Swiss-Prot record:
ATP binds at V18, G60, C61, G62, K63, T64, E65, D250, E315, R387. The keyword Nucleotide-binding applies. It is found in: Cytoplasm. It holds the Pfam family ClpB_D2-small. It comes from the Bacteria. Its main location: cytoplasm. The lineage of its organism: Bacteria, Pseudomonadati, Pseudomonadota, Alphaproteobacteria, Hyphomicrobiales. This is ATP-dependent protease ATPase subunit HslU.
Length: 437
């Protein structure tokens, strides 16, 4: 779990996301509160429940990007899902409890990675010995082994082929069978390969010919897993989910009931009702054991173009007590998105063209023109936020991108006049497209 202060979390998000200070503050405080709760002792620690968040804002203003960046910062089990993927319990499709099962799998992956790091030195030594055994045989003299060990460490034997016995997981072609109504069996999907493997005496190694350089990764994973206690790992992963798990529930506005519909919708109101106990706190059966969701943090987000937050079930609104509104982006925001963020669109474009030997330069008035065109098209057609910049920028560099191979060594300056020339028909075409079937 991250130990960053709220200020540090916000400044880290600022590197990639322009504006939206209120949303950044809300998620930073929520993330820090996870750490604060861990410092409490006794019964009070169990009583402190996470304050779930509802982020409201137009499309393309940074809601999903905040989730992506938060996942890297959290250093805790984090899962981003779309609310539209789920259906009401009892119907064909994924039910909302699958969220917790997926979160447990994420936690197991994180915990396994951490455990592997802890035994890395021992695993490296074991992997090296297995490669040496394959190269010179287990009965070789110590002097021979030392000589080959030196060559191995100096990468002199990387292109040599060896035969190793690697334990393989189920073959890729083995089918998955769904068994309806099996709780916690990962949607009831049973891998026949796993079942056959266990019936035939476990995962026995299969001799494979492989280059020395390619052998290290599978051998390291195999030797690390031998040194890790799987049962303890799963217990630790479940504990991490229960105390530090974070679920980002995107597109929650799409599961609001349609006006004028009296019956519950399979993938709308029914899903909202199923989410209630999950967010409030319940116990979900998974194939690794029961998981409590009392202290899992839920961050929901939606554009609410057609519906409004009040259209959500009142009980669901009550379970998302912190409400944050994200602001539509302005011309200045667009200019910052183009230039100021760490992996800005202009930096990406310039770097891509440099691979062809073409040097692109954007003048300040070109950046201003790009931002203004994006805002104009958003206001006249459909507001898709920062995503509009990609449309405009691709239109501007389309010709350069197509002919870049023939222009190696050139420097291509892009100014406001060039931008206007390339995008002059964009807004009018977009307007006309409304009337063309």
């Amino acid at each position: 779990m991250t130990t960053f202060s709220p200020r540090e979390i916000v400044s880290e998000l600022d590197r990639f996301i322009v504006g939206q200070h209120d949303a950044k503050r809300a998620v930073a405080i929520a993330l820090r509160n996870r750490w604060r709760r861990q410092q409490l002792t006794g019964p009070l620690r169990e009583e402190v429940a996470p304050k779930n968040i509802l982020m409201i804002g137009p499309t393309g203003c940074g809601k999903t990007e905040i989730a992506r960046r938060l996942a890297r910062l959290a250093n805790a089990p984090f899962l981003k899902v779309e609310a539209t993927k789920f259906t009401e319990v009892g119907y064909v499709g994924r039910d909302v409890e699958q969220i917790v099962r997926d979160l447990v799998e994420v936690a197991i992956g994180l915990t396994r990675q951490a455990k592997r790091e802890g035994v890395k030195a021992k695993a490296e030594a074991a992997a090296e010995n297995r490669i040496l055994d394959a190269l010179v045989g287990p009965t070789a003299s110590q002097a021979t082994r030392d000589s080959f060990r030196r060559k191995l460490r100096n990468s002199e034997l990387d292109d040599k082929e060896v035969e190793l016995e690697l334990t393989s997981s189920a073959p890729a072609g083995m089918p998955m069978f769904e068994i309806p109504g099996v709780p916690g069996a990962s949607m009831g999907a049973i891998n026949i390969g796993d079942m056959l493997g266990k019936a035939l005496g476990g995962q026995r190694g299969k001799p494979r010919r492989i280059l020395v350089r390619d052998a290290y990764a599978p051998l390291m994973a195999e030797e690390s897993d031998k040194l890790v206690d799987d049962e303890a790992l799963v217990r630790e992963a479940i504990r991490e989910v229960e105390n530090n798990g974070i679920v980002f529930l995107d597109e929650i506005d799409k599961i609001c009931a349609r006006e004028g519909r009296s019956s519950g919708d399979v993938s709308r109101e029914g899903v909202q009702r199923d989410l209630l106990p999950l967010i409030e706190g319940t116990t979900v059966a998974t194939k690794h054991g029961p998981v409590k969701t009392d202290h899992v943090l839920f961050i929901a987000s939606g554009a609410f173009h057609v519906s409004k937050p009040a259209d959500l079930l009142p009980e669901l609104q009550g379970r998302l007590p912190i409400r944050v509104e994200l602001q539509p982006l302005t011309v200045d925001d667009f200019k910052q998105i183009l230039t100021a963020t760490e992996a800005s669109l202009l930096k990406q474009t310039v770097a891509l063209m440099e691979t062809e030997g073409v040097t692109l330069t954007f003048t300040d008035d070109a950046v201003d023109a790009l931002a203004r065109v994006a805002v104009e098209v958003n206001s006249s057609v459909e507001n898709i936020g920062a995503r509009r910049l990609q449309t405009v920028l691709e239109r501007v560099i389309d010709e350069i991108s197509f002919t870049a191979t023939d222009r190696s060594g050139e420097t291509v300056p892009i100014d406001a006049a060039y931008v206007r020339e390339r995008v002059q028909d964009l807004a009018s075409n977009a307007d006309l497209s409304r009337f063309i079937l």
